[in-house]
Amino acid sequence: SKPLADCLQCNVCQKTGKCVFTDDGVNAFTEKAKHADGFVFATPVYYAHPSGRIFDFLDRAFSSAGDVFKFKPGAAVAVARRGGTTASLDALNKYFGISQMPIAGSTYWNMVHGNVAEDAPCDAEGMQTMRNLASNMIWMMRCFAIGKKSGVPYPDTETGARTNFIRR
């Protein structure tokens, strides 16, 4: 119920590992995320895009603690009355892709439709998609745990090159 501040791109978190805003749960979440095996982020769809709150939350969480998410499976879910779900999923999946997170899919796009929350269970295909998504997430997390326990190393990450579209 507290408002979420948007990321100021102040880059203080790059030095401290924590966001400068401390009273809205983002830092507490990233601490808990260190011990998580995977993530599902869901959003209502407003005007054919994710809610501003989830953007504020994810911008700050991924900027301040991006390595916490690395090599952990992620899934996005969008809920709408009608349109905008695929655009919303695309926007949320960007956080996973840039953070080296495998993206969990399902048997259809990870979306549920309904005008109000009580409508969602009536979306038979949406509910089936959510059940399959849950099964796929569990399977991925189990596979990753077996790999980790067996000593399979994470892939090396090449760094150093950064391109700017402005050349002088």
Where are these regions (language model features)?
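Short connector loops at secondary-structure junctions
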Residues: 1-7, 106-116
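N-terminal beta1-alpha1-beta2 submodule of the flavodoxin-like/Rossmannoid cofactor-binding fold
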Residues: 1-64, 120-168
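Short, glycine-/small-residue-rich phosphate/pyrophosphate-handling segment
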Residues: 52, 65-113, 122-131
